[in-house]
Amino acid sequence: GTVRWMQAYGHADLDQDKPMGKSTLLNIGSISKTFTATAIMQLWEQGRLDLDADINTYLSRPIRNPAHPDVPITVQQLLTHTSSIRDGAAYDESYACGDPTISLKAWIEGYFQSGGNYYDTKENFYAKAPGAEHAYSNIGFGVLGLLVEEITEKPLYQYTREHIFTPLQMDHTGWLLSEVDTNSHARPYFFVTAENIEMLRVCLNFVFEPQMDGFWL
């Protein structure tokens, strides 16, 4: 295709009065869920994954809502936020500056396995069974990312670069700070009591601990 129109607005840095440019890098938050879902659907197209299958078909460590141990969680339920997986306290507590220090697999297993660092039956799951109701779940998309890793035997960031970013010529897109030129990154700000509060420069990529800019991917 051909780009018909492109324009940037606003400031990349307020202190330096630096305008936003067409090549300025930005944190995209939950928009990254689009890439996770695309990776899942690619695997479905290849016949490597069944959307209606129990996710434990593909995971090395099983995940079940302890209140409904006999009800499987499906891939489709993760995609549609109906899995009964809840963003517990560990979700917010695990935000950190910079690239992740533990793997996605290690974090997810710590969240869902009894005895794990982040395991909490009430915090991590809803009372209703999988498929019963819609409830937005960032952690659920983290599980989808782990499904991609388990099936392809590649880190999510590597799979998406090879099969999504590179084919689409998205050469300045990535999950990790180490994948991009941070000098081209807009300076992030918090919005607090009508004031723009600058985040620490070292927190350019305010990422969720397990290898994904996100679950607010």
List where the protein language model places each region:
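Short, surface-exposed loop or secondary-structure junction motifs
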Residues: 13, 67-217
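Short, glycine/proline-biased beta-turn/loop segments that scaffold the active-site neighborhood
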Residues: 51-66, 167-168
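Short, conserved catalytic-motif segment at the N-terminal edge
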Residues: 1-26, 50, 118-125
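A broad detector of the eukaryotic-type serine/threonine protein kinase catalytic domain
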Residues: 25, 60-64, 126
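Generic hydrophobic/packing signal
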Residues: 39-44, 59, 79-86
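Active-site SXXK
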Residues: 1, 25-55, 141-149
